[in-house]
Amino acid sequence: MAAGAFILGSTGLCGYQMLRFAEKSSLFDKISTVGRKLPDFKSEKVHLIQEADSDKWPEIIEKEAKGYSTFFSGLGSTIGAAGSAENFERIDYGINYAAAKAAKKAGVQTFVLISAPLSNANSRFLYIRTKGKLEDDIIALKFARTIILRPGILLGEREKFRSITESIIVGISKYTHGNFLSALTVPAYGEEMGQIAVNLASEPIPQSQTEPIVNIISAKQITNLAKKL
């Protein structure tokens, strides 16, 4: 039976690929996305909603995702790109959590989140702590199924400027991808992430399931899943 999917962060590295693979999937007959900018994507299945004010997104999500089965979030930033720690938290935690609450109100069953390795709400490091708090609070919403993907370094073309350090790490990762050294950097391509996210969300929730399901997929597990694509 076909269902609907809502995608947040569809202009990003992972979000755009989730949009691509969700559109190809026979599971989803309608896909919606909202953002300040819209992806360069045309399909009769896809409803693109442009809204510059992210404070209005929860209301849009709650209305648009009514009856949808799945919500994908690839929305994320870095402290450098966000411009400040406060703005980073507002984007990575605030917007994502508000969207998750709206998706829950809309009746979404499966929530898929692109997170980060070592996410921990008790960490002393802002990036890891913010990711961990978001994971914990989304799990607490008790979707029928929550899927959290924790990729290592994400590879692929990005419009935004990378720091010199990140560029060096990414350069090394391209040579370790798929070999025995990959455990050191555990890179993942955006295209792989999109396909894996959609594949996992496409698996049926057991009808006998009474408790919320939480699947946390580590960077190593993502690497193993990518080899099977």
Curated annotation (Swiss-Prot):
Subcellular location: Mitochondrion outer membrane
Recorded topology in the membrane: Peripheral membrane protein
Cross-referenced InterPro entries: Him1/Fmp52, NAD(P)-bd_dom_sf
Gene3D superfamilies: NAD(P)-binding Rossmann-like Domain (3.40.50.720)
Pfam families in alphabetical order: HIM1
Keyword rRNA-binding: no
Biological processes annotated in GO: import into nucleus
Coiled coil: none
Keywords, comma-separated and alphabetical: Membrane, Mitochondrion, Mitochondrion outer membrane, Transit peptide
Residue span of the annotated presequence: 1-45
One GO CC term on file: mitochondrial outer membrane
KW Magnesium (keyword) present: no
Domain of life: Eukaryota
Stated family: Belongs to the FMP52 family.
UniProt protein name: Protein FMP52-2, mitochondrial
Lineage: Eukaryota, Fungi, Dikarya, Ascomycota, Saccharomycotina
